[in-house]
Amino acid sequence: MAPNPRKSHPLLKMINNSLIDLPAPSNISAWWNFGSLLALCLATQILTGLLLAMHYTADTTLAFSSVAHTCRDVQYGWLIRNMHANGASFFFICVYLHIGRGFYYGSYLHKETWNTGVLLLLTLMATAFVGYVLPWGQMSFWGATVITNMFSAIPYIGQTIVEWAWGGFSVDNPTLTRFFALHFLLPFLIAGLTLIHLTFLHESGSNNPLGIISNCDKIPFHPYYSLKDILGLMLLLLPLTTLALFSPNLLGDPENFTPANPLVTPPHIKPEWYFLFAYAILRSIPNKLGGVLALAASVLVLFLSPLLHKSKQRTMAFRPLSQLLFWTLVANLLILTWIGSQPLEHPFIIIGQLASTTYFTILLVLFPITSALENKMLNF
């Protein structure tokens, strides 16, 4: 019998073992679809971004008008830009749901996969931030100024780091040029990290909703999960194209229709909606360094998840108290997102401070205590 090139060819063999003959648990739900959706988001963003970069000029005098030119004069330029801008929002929706699923079902116990995932999140956040600056609108400029200025809170070397990042004494042409270079480069770093993420995942195999070892009951990835993923892709592309075609500016900031002006500060500086929860945590501490540390901790706390797992059960499927706590955390994050979009005045300040405190308390204190309590209740 002739050897099957799919199983013997060095390159095809790798693809086969990752996407075709990969043994997958038979009971993974739609919550496991988000990995492939994120791959689709990344591919879409790289493709649309490449097409946009062909028409973009990274210069403070031309950036804003080059984006307008893309939308007005380039064939389907408006569609490419709208898909890219709203694709970022859907990218983050998928990322947050993917992390939430990992947290709910205890997937963080695959430590290497989880840690590379958190690194991916940090890289994605950096990419989105530098990308937001490129259209050179008012909110782009002032967002860049405010967020990069945070690094000046680092004792002794802070101001030097900020001026080095800016390429001068304020956000100006050198800043825009380097941000464009970084925005072009980082998605390929994300693609590389994704391969590492997948390598670690396929080393241990996927988790499943029951949180038990599923070696005795595996099915091939293709055709079962490949078809399931295609359904997921369709369900993702439908709202994305709907948003891009019917209401492309829904999630954007109206300030960005005004070209950047260093002499006029917008009444309320805020980042894109997917960073608002972290922005609310940053603003809830009335000290610059404290705020920056809290901002960093709001994402870096995910690295501690494997260490804070005290339950004898892996998933939350059979842990009602932890479930209640998990959904409280979700509600808390939604409150933080809302607070981040509001001006810094009463009662939003105190709500933000309470929500920020609750966020860290749930993750660092209440989850381990609840897990230990559930172990005791179940006589583990």
Swiss-Prot record:
Keyword terms of this UniProt record: Electron transport, Heme, Iron, Membrane, Metal-binding, Mitochondrion, Mitochondrion inner membrane, Respiratory chain, Transmembrane, Transmembrane helix, Transport, Ubiquinone
GO CC entries: mitochondrial inner membrane; respiratory chain complex III
GO biological process annotation, one example: mitochondrial electron transport, ubiquinol to cytochrome c
Coiled coil segments of this chain: none
Molecular function terms, GO-annotated: metal ion binding; ubiquinol-cytochrome-c reductase activity
Membrane topology classification: Multi-pass membrane protein
Binding site for a ubiquinone: 202
Keyword Cell membrane appears in the UniProt entry: no
Subcellular location: Mitochondrion inner membrane
Keyword Hydrolase: no
Superkingdom field: Eukaryota
Binding residues for heme b b562: 84, 183
InterPro entries linked: Cyt_b/b6_C, Cyt_b/b6_C_sf, Cyt_b/b6_N, Cytb/b6-like_sf, Cytochrome_b, Cytochrome_b_C_euk/bac, Cytochrome_b_N_euk/bac, Di-haem_cyt_TM
Pfam family, one: Cytochrom_B_C
Cofactor details (free text): Binds 2 heme b groups non-covalently.
Annotated residues for binding of heme b b566: 98, 197
Main location: mitochondrion
Co-factor(s): heme b
Transmembrane spans: 34-54, 78-99, 114-134, 179-199, 227-247, 289-309, 321-341, 348-368
Additional observations: Heme 1 (or BL or b562) is low-potential and absorbs at about 562 nm, and heme 2 (or BH or b566) is high-potential and absorbs at about 566 nm.
Assembly, per entry: The cytochrome bc1 complex contains 11 subunits: 3 respiratory subunits (MT-CYB, CYC1 and UQCRFS1), 2 core proteins (UQCRC1 and UQCRC2) and 6 low-molecular weight proteins (UQCRH/QCR6, UQCRB/QCR7, UQCRQ/QCR8, UQCR10/QCR9, UQCR11/QCR10 and a cleavage product of UQCRFS1). This cytochrome bc1 complex then forms a dimer.
Family from the record: Belongs to the cytochrome b family.
Functional description taken from the UniProt entry: Component of the ubiquinol-cytochrome c reductase complex (complex III or cytochrome b-c1 complex) that is part of the mitochondrial respiratory chain. The b-c1 complex mediates electron transfer from ubiquinol to cytochrome c. Contributes to the generation of a proton gradient across the mitochondrial membrane that is then used for ATP synthesis.
Protein name (record): Cytochrome b
